[in-house]
Amino acid sequence: MVSGRVQALLEQLRAQGIRDELVLNALAAVPREKFIDEAFEHKAWENIALPIGQGQTISQPYMVARMTELLELTPQSRVLEIGTGSGYQTAILAHLVHHVCSVERIKGLQWQARRRLKQLDLHNVSTRHGDGWQGWQARAPFDAIIVTAAPPEIPTALMAQLDEGGILVLPVGDEQQFLKRVRRRGGEFIIDTVEAVRFVPLVKGELA
């Protein structure tokens, strides 16, 4: 049974243009309050980003839904997430595909996310402490890659790890950021600009 707060959020997301009911069902199934600090639990089902510590945030539900929808996932999709963060986006993906690979550069966040996912019986996730700019070469290629922090330009390593027909969704930019979708077709990469966004920066090389 979906609560009134959850139902209200889903209706808001539909009004904002989210059409994929499988994505909306995944959002309804994942308890967002489990991925944030107790002090913010009363805001868990509001359509806003919230701080999770270490200078990072949990994205607003609209952006989670929009980026996930753009990936065009099937249950068989091989998915890489860059920026595990709280584990919320990871959990949404885990409800939609058979297996998710996720990279996080901040060790403390990685461990917290693993604990939360285990508590929710989501065992179809592999996490790695590493530099998101480099992706996860050992697990490549991927059908879908999602990046939850903004690099100033599209990392070439991530493009190289896309399989034929694969999709990369990420925010790009410094002061001015835009959500981009990159699709690999043959030897070419087709890049579409989706909308203006605001994300924390994707830090390069530096593990914490």
Swiss-Prot record:
**Which CDD domains has this protein been placed in?**
AdoMet_MTases
**Which keywords accompany this UniProt record?**
Cytoplasm, Methyltransferase, S-adenosyl-L-methionine, Transferase
Catalytic center at which residues? S59
Reaction(s) catalysed by this chain, per the record, are: [protein]-L-isoaspartate + S-adenosyl-L-methionine = [protein]-L-isoaspartate alpha-methyl ester + S-adenosyl-L-homocysteine
Location of the protein in the cell: Cytoplasm
Return the broad EC class: transferase
Which GO BP annotation is one of this protein's?
A: protein modification process
Q: Name one GO molecular function term.
A: protein-L-isoaspartate (D-aspartate) O-methyltransferase activity
Documented EC number(s): 2.1.1.77
Q: What is its main location?
A: cytoplasm
GO annotations of cellular component type: cytoplasm
Q: Which HAMAP family match?
A: PIMT
- What family does this chain come from, according to its entry? Belongs to the methyltransferase superfamily. L-isoaspartyl/D-aspartyl protein methyltransferase family.
Instruction: Tell me which PANTHER family the record gives.
Output: PROTEIN-L-ISOASPARTATE O-METHYLTRANSFERASE (PTHR11579), PROTEIN-L-ISOASPARTATE(D-ASPARTATE) O-METHYLTRANSFERASE (PTHR11579:SF0)
Any idea what job this protein has? Catalyzes the methyl esterification of L-isoaspartyl residues in peptides and proteins that result from spontaneous decomposition of normal L-aspartyl and L-asparaginyl residues. It plays a role in the repair and/or degradation of damaged proteins.
Cited NCBIfam families: pimt, PRK00312.1
Descriptive protein name? Protein-L-isoaspartate O-methyltransferase
State the organism of origin. Salmonella schwarzengrund (strain CVM19633)
Gene that this polypeptide is encoded by: pcm
